[in-house]
Curated annotation (Swiss-Prot):
Protein's UniProt name: Putative 8-amino-7-oxononanoate synthase
Protein encoded by which gene: bioF
Record key words, sorted: Biotin biosynthesis, Pyridoxal phosphate, Transferase
Binding sites annotated in the UniProt record for substrate: 18, 131, 352
Homology family: Belongs to the class-II pyridoxal-phosphate-dependent aminotransferase family. BioF subfamily.
Oligomeric form and interacting partners: Homodimer.
Entries under Gene3D superfamilies matching the protein: Aspartate Aminotransferase, domain 1, Type I PLP-dependent aspartate aminotransferase-like (Major domain)
Length: 380
């Protein structure tokens, strides 16, 4: 045990020690250590997670005849239920794509997709800032990979020119909205690059965009009219959609490859049908939340301006607003101060973000009021 204690002590000395907090949730508020605070760190972007009207409508829809609370098995054994197929068909229809496939979480999706679709003769080119789940999927793929500089498409093009001919297939991997900086990938440029090289596929994670962007809330790819051009479009239900699980939209061939070769899908007990039914209920109503999306964008634009005045650094274009302070100690102190003022703000430091870019990751939700965000900004 000594070596493990030393590791923990080292993390503590570097202000990188993590622990699971004891929290009480009350709608938009969180109580921690007897302090009730407005939650400024949630991924519940549309503010649906505590919407009692939605919950009531969902429960009334089923009366007392609820879907099963467990699948008890993998979908490939006895764990498949009609509601899974119903949701996959709805997702594919909304995206106007041939197929969709469900996963237990965004982490499961990103962990399993690339290993299932690559060989030791394949190449992966990933944005430097992609999520840890994508990095883990890349590592499990056992194929060659390079990480291009963040949103630097000249660097990506150079890597493509030097390497594509040496491999049987190439995957370009990116997020659309990046989870720590809140900036947005140029999907149009990525599609154009993909088309210039043979056997090259584009894989985009819309975890922080689904529900929030696009006329129907389908993400940045919808906003930019590029859904049909992206080979694998992945998103989660656990953020703006207030549920659990994830999806990929793709063609039928890729879907069947994933069903046959994706280990996290094959060997995991499927999500409870009850949860999938809730996801269906929310996803079906996604186009109706345009008012929430518009209000969220107004709040976000205001807070981005306020933070930029204080830091002179503002990469964000979205409702994820990084308040970059640099060092760990300053960031921890600022987070503690803001919590004392009644705002649940969390510090983010290395290795989650690059060294000397520790920040408070602020994320806004559509159920916040303009006055609440103004009062918060005054505390910065």
């Amino acid at each position: 045990m000594k070596v493990f204690r030393q590791q923990l002590e080292q993390l503590g000395a570097q202000n990188q020690y993590r622990s699971i907090p004891d929290l009480i949730h009350q709608g938009r508020y969180i109580t921690r250590e007897n302090r009730k605070m407005l939650n400024m760190s949630s991924n519940d972007y549309l503010g649906l997670a505590s919407d009692e009207n939605l919950r009531r409508s969902f429960l009334q829809q089923y009366g007392g005849n609820f879907p099963s609370f467990t699948s008890s098995s993998s979908r490939l054994l006895t764990g498949n239920f009609p509601i899974y197929t119903d949701l996959e068909e709805l997702v594919a229809q909304r995206f106007q794509r041939e197929s969709a496939l469900l996963f237990n979480s965004g982490y499961h999706a990103n962990l399993g997709i690339l290993p299932a679709l690559t060989t030791t003769k394949s190449l992966i080119l990933a944005d430097k800032f992609v999520h840890a789940s994508m990095i883990d999927g890349i590592r499990l793929s056992r194929c060659a990979f390079f990480r291009y500089r963040h949103n630097d498409y000249e660097h990506l093009k150079n890597l493509l020119e030097k390497n594509v001919g040496k491999f049987d297939r190439t995957f370009i991997v990116t997020e659309s909205v990046f989870s720590m900086d809140g900036d947005v990938a140029d999907l149009k440029q990525l599609v154009q690059l993909k088309k210039q090289f043979p056997n090259t596929y584009l894989y985009v994670d819309e975890a922080h965009a689904i529900g929030v962007y696009g006329q129907n809330g389908l993400g940045i790819a919808e906003r930019d009219n590029l859904i049909a051009e992206i080979d694998l479009l992945v998103g989660t239900f656990g953020k703006a959609l207030a549920s659990v699980g994830a999806y990929a939209v793709c063609n039928q061939v890729l879907k069947e490859c994933l069903i046959n070769q994706m280990r996290p899908l094959i060997f995991s007990t499927a999500l409870p049908p009850f949860n999938v039914a809730w996801t269906y209920f929310i996803f079906e109503r996604l186009p109706q939340f345009s008012k929430e999306r518009s209000h969220l964008e107004q709040l976000s634009a205001f807070l981005r301006r306020e933070v930029a005045h204080r830091t002179q650094i503002m990469p964000s274009e979205t409702c994820i607003v990084p308040y970059i302070l640099g060092g760990n100690e300053a960031t921890l102190a600022k987070a503690e101060y803001l919590q004392g003022q009644g705002y649940y703000c969390l510090p983010i430091g290395p290795p989650t973000v690059p060294k000397n870019t520790s920040r408070i990751r602020l994320s806004l939700t559509a159920d916040m009021t303009t006055d609440e965000v103004r009062q918060f900004a005054a505390c910065l």
